[in-house]
Amino acid sequence: MTKDDLKPHPKGRDAYRLFIPFATRWRDNDQYGHMNNAVYYELFDSAINKFLIDAEILDTAGGTAMFLVAASACNYFQEVAYPSDIEVGLAISRLGSSSINYDLGLFVAGADTTAATGSLVHVNVSGN
């Protein structure tokens, strides 16, 4: 194993099961003219919550399920800026008895490899 084997690398579309489209907004850009790092996390969170709502796991109008973020990470490989159409790829890498590990990839629309990858661990604290 080399040092390069330990470095994060861009992933292809085949690493993800679901793709959720988004469009960047003018306010997403920072003073350097590219998407601010916090926006990546916002997009990852939005994609996960859309998945949970569509799967009827999360009901924002009165459901009892409550998931908290226990860990998250993001690796950046390519700049993204407004205006861009993007997609967040989502895959579940581990499903435990009270937690879910997600793998996420941010793609500029039409690209075959990720501009960024992320991971997030949700813990179900509601007992449902």
What are these regions (language model features)?
Residues 36, 44-48, 80, 86, ...:
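Generic alpha-helical secondary structure signal
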Residues 25, 77, 108:
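Residue-level recognition of the GNAT/N-acetyltransferase active site
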